[in-house]
Each structure stands twice: as C-alpha cells, then as structure tokens.
C-alpha cells in the first residue's frame, strides 16, 4: 500500500488534515490525496473536516477541483469543510 499523502488527526468534533508535501502539483499525488479525502467523507469519519494548508506553498488547479468536490460531498451528508 502506498504511503499516505495526508497527516490526519482528530480535535474534538473535527478531523484535521495536514499535507505531507509543500508542493501539490503532481497529478498522481493529487489523485492519491483526493482518494484519501473522499474516503473520510464516505466513511463519515467526521462532519467537520479542517484542511490545514499551512505548509503548502504551491497548489495545482487540479487540486482546487478536488477541494470543490470534497466540499460538495461533505455538504451532501450534512458536513462541512474548512480551509486554513
């Protein structure tokens, strides 16, 4: 199994996600991140997902599309996605 692209921990009622890479530009990395993020929503791991982009310097437009889809998926089950 491939190494996770995310560092995930829980604080109170939220799942907090940090990213292992400061540059999220490669489509294979973005696809792996998407699978992991969507799995959090599909498993209903938390109603609130906080994405911490503090260590990210570069983000491809493909990754923005992933964030939009993640937000829609979360809202469809009554959840929310927060970005910091």
Language-model segment annotations:
Residues 2-35:
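STAS-typified acidic loop motif
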Residues 23-84:
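Amphipathic alpha-helical interaction surfaces in cytosolic regulatory modules
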């Amino acid at each position: 199994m491939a190494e996770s692209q995310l560092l995930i921990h829980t604080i109170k009622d939220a799942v907090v996600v940090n990213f292992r890479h400061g540059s999220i530009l490669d489509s294979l990395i973005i696809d792996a991140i998407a699978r992991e993020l969507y799995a959090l929503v599909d498993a209903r791991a938390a109603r609130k997902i906080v994405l911490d982009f503090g260590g990210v310097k570069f983000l491809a437009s493909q990754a923005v599309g992933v964030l939009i889809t993640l937000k829609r998926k979360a809202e469809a089950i009554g959840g929310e996605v927060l970005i910091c």
